[in-house]
From Swiss-Prot:
Gene3D superfamilies given in the database record: Ribosomal protein L28/L24
InterPro entries: Ribosomal_bL28, Ribosomal_bL28/bL31-like_sf, Ribosomal_bL28_bact-type, Ribosomal_bL28_sf
Gene assigned in the entry: rpmB
Gene Ontology biological process terms, A to Z: translation
Lineage of producing organism: Bacteria, Pseudomonadati, Pseudomonadota, Betaproteobacteria, Burkholderiales
Family assignment from sequence similarity: Belongs to the bacterial ribosomal protein bL28 family.
Protein name: Large ribosomal subunit protein bL28
UniProt keyword list: Ribonucleoprotein, Ribosomal protein
Annotated transmembrane regions: none
Organism: Polynucleobacter asymbioticus (strain DSM 18221 / CIP 109841 / QLW-P1DMWA-1)
Any single Gene Ontology cellular-component annotation: cytosolic large ribosomal subunit
GO MF annotation, one: structural constituent of ribosome
Statement: the UniProt record of this protein carries the keyword Ribosomal protein: yes
Length: 77
């Protein structure tokens, strides 16, 4: 399963580990993904989403129905 937020689209980033001696080695910065279930009152069922903490804040701000309609318009669900 891809490490991508279904709401915000955040993906892993690539960067460097930097030691005290300034040696650099490649690393990945992973998004803070959480599996969450949301009760959708209009559909009378649970929806499972894999999203980041930022995605949770978007749902808190806009509501689950608005976010789901946006996801369906993009073809995510």
């Amino acid at each position: 399963m891809a490490k991508v937020c279904q709401v915000t689209g955040k993906k892993p980033m690539v960067g460097n580990n930097v030691s005290h001696a300034n040696n650099k080695t490649k690393r990945r910065f992973l998004p803070n993904l959480q599996n969450r279930r949301f009760w959708v009152e209009s559909e009378n069922r649970w929806i499972s989403l894999r999203l980041t903490n930022a995605g949770l804040r978007v749902i808190d701000k806009n509501g689950i129905d608005a976010v789901l309609s946006d996801l369906r318009a993009r073809g995510e669900i």
